[in-house]
UniProtKB/Swiss-Prot annotation:
Residues 19-24 form a propeptide. The lineage of its organism: Eukaryota, Metazoa, Chordata, Craniata, Vertebrata. Gene3D superfamilies: Trypsin-like serine proteases. This is Snake venom serine protease homolog 2. InterPro entries: Peptidase_S1_PA (IPR009003), Peptidase_S1_PA_chymotrypsin (IPR043504), Peptidase_S1A (IPR001314), Trypsin_dom (IPR001254). GO terms for cellular component: extracellular region; secretory granule. GO terms for molecular function: serine-type endopeptidase activity; toxin activity. Belongs to the peptidase S1 family. Snake venom subfamily. It is found in: Secreted. It comes from Macrovipera lebetinus (Levantine viper). Residues 1-18 form the signal peptide.
Amino acid sequence: MVLIRVLANLLVLQLSYAQKSSELVIGGDECNINEHPFPVALHTARSKRFYCAGTLINQEWVLTAARCDRKNIRIILGVHSKNVPNEDQQIRVPKEKFFCLSSKTYTRWDKDIMLIRLKKPVNDSTHIVPLSLPSSPPSVGSVCRIMGWGTITTTKVTYPDVPHCANINMFDYSVCRKVYRKLPEKSRTLCAGILQGGIDSCKVDNGGPLICNGQIQGIVSWGGHPCAQPHKPALYTNVFDYTDWIQSIIAGNITATCPP
């Protein structure tokens, strides 16, 4: 049954990629309720407001950005509407958190990644299914998918009740280097967006997934301010570069180190 659910959700994703890229996270269309069983929403015990997102990669582990670390994190799985919970919605807290560096330091172009082990594993359900880690890096020119509960307008902060989705394009890293002059010659980040602007991940989407061919290829990290400007793609942590570290941590090797 779990395999059937996974295959069904991959089919939904493939159909989504075939759509015309007119959907927006900024001011755009709502995700289909059955399209996103793997994203999770993060909030703190003190505040019920979502501040970041993440991705369930198996029943016990969530992948997100290092910049999303907080005290007393609460992780909501199986959520669509913030105001009308799904029957299979579940809430978990971290058991352990892992970073590339013990100091939890990261930069805009390096090591913005955090792996969270849940205190209690989740059960797969209609709206809770893990997303696969990448088997290979994404190709330049790929059409990928972003989704999240981040702001849907650029002139002011407007948070939606349900997540919004968009298709964006994968660019060569050099495209982002031309825009963001402080980027190093090489980094473990992906450059993706829409060059004419109007489509982008934005505030509170941080930590959420960039999905290509049914796999998590990126983690929302940072971009231009305000979001969705022309010729200013966003940057995403390149998950493929960290797969060995992720798999080592999950296997119990908690001293595993990230690639330099």
